[in-house]
UniProtKB/Swiss-Prot annotation:
Subunit text: Homotetramer.
Reactions catalysed: oxaloacetate + phosphate = phosphoenolpyruvate + hydrogencarbonate
UniProt record, GO biological process: carbon fixation; oxaloacetate metabolic process; tricarboxylic acid cycle
Keyword Ligase: no
Full protein name: Phosphoenolpyruvate carboxylase
EC number from the UniProt entry: 4.1.1.31
The keyword Coiled coil appears for this protein: no
Superkingdom of this protein's organism: Archaea
Gene that this polypeptide is encoded by: ppcA
Length: 511
């Protein structure tokens, strides 16, 4: 049996600080190849996700890794000891990138030939897994698996002319199959994930399956509590399915450093391991790696790699029904407020520092992402924008919990263990001065501000959260938030950008 990675380094552009080895503030090109090597060698991460979604991708990454760092990769076999996993564009959603999907798939046999030359015959398959983002049905991942088998691996049997086959020209094509990891990002698909996985299992018959649960984008689209509870429902469903099919499922969770995006940081990783029992692989995003002291980062990654994997909490039907109800109530409260703040979020997001060379995709669940009826920036910029205007998104929609009775509240608390801790971490950065300033700058309605105030009041009076400045960092962040809004109002954008960067350094994450 192969090693199942515990940690997966990603290229999420959420870092405030720029790593010393980067040639510029925007990490791209050769720097991303170097970053992949450093993730393995310096940080001890088991797996690197190589992202072809929403950006120009270098499909020669394996060639560059093996030729630039031969000593390391002779000792650590790519595909056996450490892993490289492609994140594809979803051809059904991202129409402009359909051919990038094809190009990335076509590059997999090239990596096989390179590894054969480097390691010897039959030693390893360096790239054998792909991640399909925005998966909503089993048909999508079945199609990806079959596309590779039929359109890539089997093309070596095509006859060109007069008995001459493709393989006579370019050699045989390996591997013959790939493993597809669905990345599930929307609420309904997370809560019905068993249908996606079971349908794939019945057709493809894999020996095991890795399933990627998003935590960041569902928070942006439906609110933090909806995202957490949807992941809990998904983990329960996956473990039930694993038992009923007698088939191993290894969940991955996509988590960032701030509470809204998952709260996995070198300072909070133990709480996240406790929160998401049953998860095998945790994403190590850029803020985790570059916004904290290196020794602390390396130690945290080592601890995650060596931590025990506890079983997921299996939900009874009545518990699951309560959690589903909460996600609907919460989203109904959260989305209209976000729609009202969309202009503010979009205006601020374009001023945040850029950390990756990413192309912008437009449209529902593309990039930009959408919540309800409005287009929004990517999740990192979304979160960074709301923190910067002094309204952490963790607080938005929270008063919807007032609709729960005592039994429902108990079920909620049992299934979101670190709820109060996550909320308190975010609430330190709340700025009371924001209301007047955002009303003035973006003409935010009294109704929207009244709703946010209800959420704030509920967090304080019912949950017992302390809002605003409780230490030097939070006080400084609040001051910077007011200065940012004032400079933005006066259109002194160079100063606005400076304050945004300073706040990101305090949070140890752009968003």
């Amino acid at each position: 049996m192969r090693i199942i990675p515990r940690t997966m380094s990603t290229q999420h552009p959420d870092n405030a600080k720029v790593p010393e080895w980067a040639k510029s503030e925007v990490i791209e090109g050769e720097d991303e190849v170097k970053e992949a090597f450093l993730a393995y060698s310096m940080y001890g991460v088991h797996e690197v996700m190589w992202d072809a979604e929403g950006k120009d991708v270098d499909t020669h990454v394996v060639r560059k890794l093996l030729s630039n760092y031969p000593d390391y990769f002779r000792e650590h076999i790519l595909g056996k000891d450490v892993f490289l996993t492609y994140r594809l564009p979803n051809p059904k959603v991202e129409g402009a990138d359909r051919k990038v999907f094809a190009e990335t798939m076509e590059s997999i046999p090239i990596t096989y030939d390179l590894a054969e030359k480097f390691y010897g015959n039959g030693i390893t398959v360096p790239v054998f897994e792909v991640i399909l983002p925005m998966t909503t049905s089993n048909l999508e991942i079945i199609s990806v698996a079959r596309y590779y088998e039929k359109a890539v691996a089997n093309e070596d049997e095509l006859e060109l002319y007069n008995g001459v086959k493709v393989k006579d020209l370019v050699g045989e094509i390996y591997p013959k199959v790939i493993e597809v990891i669905p990345l599930v990002e929307d609420r309904d698909s997370l809560q019905n994930i068993d249908n996606i996985v079971e349908g794939y299992y019945k057709v493809i018959k894999p020996k095991y399956m890795r399933v990627f649960l998003a935590r960041s984008d569902p928070a942006m689209n439906y609110g933090m509590i909806t995202a957490v509870l949807s992941v809990k429902i998904a983990l329960s469903e996956l473990y039930k399915l694993s038992e009923s099919l007698n088939f191993e499922i290894y969940p991955i969770i996509g988590v960032g450093s701030l509470p809204f995006r998952g709260h996995l940081s070198p300072e909070n990783y133990e709480k996240v391991l406790e929160e998401y029992k049953g998860v095998y692989t945790y994403t190590i995003q850029s803020a985790f790696k570059y916004d904290y002291d290196y020794d602390k980062v390396k130690s945290a990654i080592s601890s995650i790699n060596n931590s025990r994997i506890g079983p997921a909490k299996i939900l009874e039907k009545y518990e699951e029904d309560v959690l589903r109800k909460i996600t609907i109530l919460y989203t109904e409260r959260y989305q209209p407020i976000i729609e009202s703040l969309a202009n503010a979020i979009n205006d601020v997001s374009v001023l945040l520092p850029r950390r990756r060379a990413r192309k912008l995709h437009i449209g529902l669940f593309g990039y930009s992402r959408s919540a309800g009826k409005v287009s929004l920036p990517r999740a990192i910029s979304f979160v960074g924008s709301l923190y910067s205007i002094g309204i952490p998104p963790e607080l938005i929609g929270i008063s919807s919990l007032s609709n729960l009775d005592e039994k429902e509240w108990d079920i909620f608390k049992q299934n979101y263990v670190n709820f109060k801790h996550d909320l308190q971490t975010a609430a330190r950065f709340f700025n009371w001065e924001s209301f007047e300033l955002i009303k003035d700058i973006w003409k935010i309605s009294e109704d929207t501000i009244a709703k946010i105030k209800e959420d704030i009041d509920y967090a304080e009076s019912v949950i017992g959260i302390k809002l605003g400045d409780i230490d030097y960092d939070s006080r400084k962040h609040i001051l910077m938030s007011s200065l940012f809004l004032l400079s933005f109002k006066e259109k002194i954008l160079q100063e606005s950008k400076k304050y945004l960067y300073e706040m990101a350094l305090i949070r140890r994450s752009l968003g």
